[in-house]
């Protein structure tokens, strides 16, 4: 997985150099990088990071949310685990859910913050936050995406909309 992240980082760095020459076609690799990162985070091997085994145990034992088995997992994770367990017992279903929403919110926020240097923003995100938010602390990924969108709303004076984003997160 580390080599895949490094490869995507190198491709993103190259695209950030070439971005001014790409015109409107830059959105195609932008979306492809987003999809690749979603699949990479959502389909990772359980045990590759410190928290995935805990998430897998909590996913399989969602019925014991208040028990010592899961260690007091938050309610949204328990509800999502119950929903996805109805369809499959594979923990990657919830990994894909969190990766999809976390990365989609962040990539949408990046396009709202900047129109010209999107690949540079993605490159910085990959360097500092991707592995932490989307791979290790998966629930934090959605909250940080909502937080980025809330900052824009606060800057535009729409505090109620910002509060809504934070409440969703």
Can you describe what each PLM-predicted range is?
Residues 1-37:
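Start-transfer (signal-anchor) and selected internal transmembrane alpha helices
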Residues 24, 28, 107-127:
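Transmembrane-helix signature of polytopic, membrane-embedded enzymes
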Residues 53-89:
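Short hydrophobic/aromatic helix or loop-helix immediately within or flanking a transmembrane segment
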Residues 87-104:
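Loop-to-helix entry region of an early transmembrane alpha helix in multi-pass inner-membrane enzymes
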Residues 100, 141-151:
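Alpha-helical transmembrane segments of multi-pass membrane proteins
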Residues 130, 161-169:
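Membrane-interface alpha helices of multi-pass inner-membrane proteins
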Residues 135-141:
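Short acidic/glycine- and proline-prone juxtamembrane loop motifs at membrane-interface regions
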Residues 147-161:
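Membrane-interface transmembrane helices that cradle and orient dolichyl/undecaprenyl
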């Amino acid at each position: 997985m580390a080599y895949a992240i490094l490869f995507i980082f190198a491709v993103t760095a190259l695209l950030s150099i070439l971005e001014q020459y790409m015109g409107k076609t830059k959105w195609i690799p932008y979306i492809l990088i987003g999809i690749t990162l979603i699949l990479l985070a959502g389909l990772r091997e359980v045990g590759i990071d410190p928290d995935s085994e805990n998430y897998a145990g909590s996913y399989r034992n969602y019925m014991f949310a208040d028990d010592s088995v899961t260690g007091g997992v938050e309610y949204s994770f328990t509800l999502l685990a119950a929903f996805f367990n109805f369809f499959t017992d594979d923990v990657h279903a919830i990994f894909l859910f969190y990766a999809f929403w976390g990365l989609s919110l962040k990539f949408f926020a990046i396009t709202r913050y900047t129109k010209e240097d999107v690949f540079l923003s993605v490159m910085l995100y990959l360097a500092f936050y991707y592995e932490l938010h989307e791979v290790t602390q998966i629930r934090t990924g959605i909250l940080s995406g909502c937080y980025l969108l809330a900052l824009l709303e606060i800057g535009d004076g729409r505090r109620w909309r910002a509060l809504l984003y934070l409440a969703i997160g």
